[in-house]
């Protein structure tokens, strides 16, 4: 009879035949396989592919940026695509002299300067205005005002002197006039400023006065004969016949051979 042998399996003593995978090795196998597959995803070939994808995505971003240009920061000027204009265009709107206006200024300019310009004498109304302003600041009524009151007195007359102008006037009064001025000295100080202020403020009344200096017969028109007659006294020199004819032709807007007051005013206007 065959003898039965009781075989006891001792843990760890059993040998595993070749070709048979133990449960532990089987568990490790997939883990090794997973690590291997992860390493394969880091293969240089895959890096090249990913870099190619990045380059393609960067290219798409670059193409998209060309469609949508970057915004300009606040305070930064946008580049102008329009071509720069030549420098000559900057001065294309300069004021061009008008022959008619030049002729009028040449004819009537000396008269107006003598009557209403910087070299004219003050009229009675202007002297009365200065007298009233002087008396307002002569508080003790002794006929003098101090240099400290000159600035306020000038402002009362409508002038706005600068600090430098006030300093010059004050120094002049203190050093040469003892710090006080009487009315005559006050007029000497103020009249140049007054003439300068009104030299370019000719009203209708002043223009009519100048017009009557030429219009001797008071018919409201200036003829060639009247222009020739008034020229030596008003302009300081006689005018030749051809020069008179040319001047009258340039200033005679309606072509009637004479200059009326409207034409006189229009030719003297500096528009």
Curated annotation (Swiss-Prot):
GO biological process: photoreceptor cell morphogenesis; phototransduction; retinal bipolar neuron differentiation; retinal cone cell development; visual perception
GO cellular component: cell projection; cytosol; presynapse
Top-rank taxon: Eukaryota
Impact when changing residue 263 to Q: Loss of calcium binding
Compositionally biased intervals (Basic residues): 87-96
Effect of residue 46 to A: No effect on phosphorylation
Chain sites annotated for binding Ca(2+) 1: 138, 140, 142, 144, 149
Sequence positions that bind Ca(2+) 3: 252, 254, 256, 258, 263
UniProt PTM comment: Phosphorylated. Phosphorylation levels change with the light conditions and regulate the activity, but has no effect on calcium binding.
Region of interest called Disordered, as start-end residue ranges on this chain: 1-105
Positions of modified residues (Phosphoserine): 37
InterPro entries: CaBP1/2/4/5, EF-hand-dom_pair, EF_Hand_1_Ca_BS, EF_hand_dom
Consequence of changing residue 149 to Q: Loss of calcium binding
Alphabetical keyword list: Calcium, Cell projection, Cytoplasm, Metal-binding, Phosphoprotein, Repeat, Synapse
UniProt binding sites for Ca(2+) 2: 215, 217, 219, 221, 226
Main location: cytoplasm
Low complexity composition bias: residue spans: 45-67
Record-annotated EF-hand domain positions: 125-160, 179-196, 202-237, 239-271
Compartment(s) of residence: Cytoplasm; Presynapse
Summary of the tissues where the protein is detected: Expressed in retina and in the inner hair cells (IHC) of the cochlea.
GO MF annotation terms: calcium ion binding; transmembrane transporter binding
Key word Calcium present: yes
Biological role stated in the UniProt entry: Involved in normal synaptic function through regulation of Ca(2+) influx and neurotransmitter release in photoreceptor synaptic terminals and in auditory transmission. Modulator of CACNA1D and CACNA1F, suppressing the calcium-dependent inactivation and shifting the activation range to more hyperpolarized voltages.
Subunit structure: Interacts with CACNA1F and CACNA1D (via IQ domain) in a calcium independent manner. Interacts (via N-terminus) with UNC119.
The protein's name: Calcium-binding protein 4
Gene: Cabp4
């Amino acid at each position: 009879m065959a003898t039965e042998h009781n075989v006891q399996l001792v843990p760890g003593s059993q040998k595993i035949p070749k070709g048979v995978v133990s449960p532990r090795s089987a568990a490790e196998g997939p883990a090794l396989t997973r690590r291997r597959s992860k390493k394969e995803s880091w293969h240089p070939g895959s890096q090249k592919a990913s870099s190619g994808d990045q380059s393609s995505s960067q290219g798409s971003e670059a193409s998209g940026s060309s469609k949508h240009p970057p915004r300009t920061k606040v305070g930064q000027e946008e580049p102008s695509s329009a071509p720069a204009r030549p420098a000559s265009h900057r001065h294309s709107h300069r004021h061009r002299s008008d022959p008619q206006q030049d002729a009028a200024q040449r004819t009537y300019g000396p008269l107006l300067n003598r009557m209403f310009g910087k070299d004219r004498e003050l009229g009675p109304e202007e002297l009365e205005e200065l007298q009233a302003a002087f008396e307002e600041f002569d508080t003790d009524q002794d006929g003098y005002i101090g240099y400290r009151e000159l600035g306020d007195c000038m402002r009362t007359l409508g002038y706005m002197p600068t600090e430098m102008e006030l300093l010059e006037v004050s120094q002049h009064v203190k050093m040469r006039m003892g710090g006080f001025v009487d009315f005559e000295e006050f007029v000497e100080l103020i009249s140049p400023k007054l003439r300068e202020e009104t030299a370019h403020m000719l009203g209708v009344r002043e223009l009519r006065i100048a017009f009557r200096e030429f219009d001797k017969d008071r018919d409201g028109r200036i003829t060639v004969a009247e222009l020739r007659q008034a020229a030596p006294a008003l302009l300081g020199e006689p005018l030749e016949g051809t020069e008179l004819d040319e001047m009258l032709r340039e200033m005679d807007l309606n072509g009637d051979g004479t200059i009326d007051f409207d034409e006189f005013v229009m030719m003297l206007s500096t528009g």
